[in-house]
Amino acid sequence: MNLGMMRRRYAKKSLPYDAEVEYLQSDGRQYIDCEVGIIYNADIVDIKTNVAFTKITSRQLNGTNGYFFWGISANRKFEFSGTEIPYNANFNVWNMHCEPYTKLKLYMNGVEYNSSSTPGDNQYSFAIYLFALGGRNNAAASFFTSQKQSNATITKNGVLVRDYIPVRVGQVGYLYDKVSARLFADKSGVGFILGPDK
């Protein structure tokens, strides 16, 4: 066995999961707390993710129903600063970019969508969730979605903070973050439906 093969085998064995899978699937109960905070009226955030909704109602990514609301709705609407913004394309690959919230600008797959809502002047913190919306000042998850989730990245103020791939340990699904080298589990305790191994 040559040195390159030995290194590849060691690297594979040292990973904290058994296999990469094509996707994790939720049924409207599960969610993942990405442990990435956003400061309202301050941060610039990009989220790139590949999602296939399995039901036509439910929202995902992150937000709250108070002063701040940012997410994607399966019924063809964006949620941004409390306002629903219709969109016309049936996206599966989501590329969201939100400028500091004082600018009230949301870009989706390169298209600008403006909200008519006016955000408050205060700076609140928000958590980014996948499969659900997070709330202001660490409020509980809400608006859970039914979807198939594959890779996802989160960039905050120009820095890559999460780079997720769906994996399994035994028959339990996780998102593995290549940035922090950590497994992120379903916070509900229900567990994800696993896609096939890659």
Predicted ranges, named:
Residues 1-21, 180-198:
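Enriched but not universal
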Residues 16-81, 156-162:
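Extracellular glycan-recognition modules
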Residues 74-96:
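Short, aromatic/His-centered strand-loop micro-motif at the edge of beta-sheets
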Residues 83-86, 111-116, 159-163:
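Surface-exposed loop/edge segments in extracytoplasmic proteins
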Residues 88-111, 155-157:
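Localized edge beta-strand/strand-to-loop motifs within extracellular or lumenal beta-rich domains
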Residues 116-148:
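Flexible glycan-contacting loops in extracellular carbohydrate-active proteins
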Residues 150-154:
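Extracellular beta-strand elements of beta-rich domains used
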Residues 157, 163-190, 198:
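Extracellular glycan/ECM-engagement signal in secreted proteins
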